Amino acid sequence: MKKIHLSAIIAALVLSACSAPNPASGVSGGRSGFTLAQQHWSDVTKIRAEARRIGAKVRDGQMTKVQAAQHLNRFRLRTSGSNIVDDSVYEIYLQAMVDSQRGTITAAQSKAMIEHALRGWQQRWPHLKNKPNNHAFNNWLLEFMGMQPLQ
């Protein structure tokens, strides 16, 4: 099995080239009455663009993975704000970056940590009573990992 280098996975995460779905603004969640914020997909796009920009800095050695994760967090807070889903996913994302930068986990383990957190929210989402309407950071990561976004 070919070894995957952590820097390649991190660069892939921060250099996400996925295109955002373009649903009608204010996508409804069906019977629950849930509606995504009108700017949600625009915010996902902004986070993706910033991730690409800082990913180049990581690749060039101008920024560490942890610094990039912290910068991306500040950006997502300014862009889409704080909410239970994004805050929770970011904590796992940051821990994965810290552990991988320290060399205590492999690239595969880092990816698995993030996927596990995302899957947890996919399972909780249908039962969540007070769903945040702009969980752009979470949906950016879900799309990048090839998973279904929360809507």
Identify the role of each PLM range.
Residues 1-8:
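Bacterial N-terminal signal peptides that target proteins for export
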Residues 14-17:
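C-terminal motif of bacterial Sec signal peptides marking the signal peptidase cleavage site
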Residues 19-21:
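Bacterial signal peptide processing site
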Residues 25-54:
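Post-signal peptide N-terminal segment of mature Sec-exported envelope proteins
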Residues 55-142:
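Mature extracellular/secreted ectodomains of secretory-pathway proteins
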